[in-house]
Amino acid sequence: GIDEKELSRLRQEMLSCTVENRAKDLLALNPAWKPAIDAADRHQLLQTILTYLKSQKELDLLNNDGIPRMVRGYFYETTCVIFEAARVLKHGAYFIMVNDNVRYAGASISVDILLSEIAGQLGFEVEQILVLPNGKGNSSQQMGMHGREALRKCVYVWRKA
């Protein structure tokens, strides 16, 4: 086993999609991820969301300054996972993912749509996005400022093209 300090070190080393973690240079970790990084860079809605969150940080309107880095890290790291799945799966194989949409600074982020569009660019056909019953709510920080909004929890069904 490992102690809490070692677990924290590993988490910091491996992930950037938490508010306390530093951004990672994904291309330094694996130069073969360039097509994945390019797909995320080209996704206009994702870039608009990241720009919005950065502006909210600059205006001191976020409850945590790490949110823009965390959201960027999540989408870029997940894009690399999707890229790797497309690389190793056989033609016709299914890739299924369960995920929640999220809301930051009053802006709902349709994670299901964004990731499915990116998956389509990286070699998957989007077969279905199944919406699970009882959408989750947003955080108490969001509700206090922006009200409650039910967010979709979905199952993505993609097939390797």
Label every PLM stretch briefly:
Residues G1-M97, N101-A161:
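Class I S-adenosyl-L-methionine-dependent methyltransferase catalytic core
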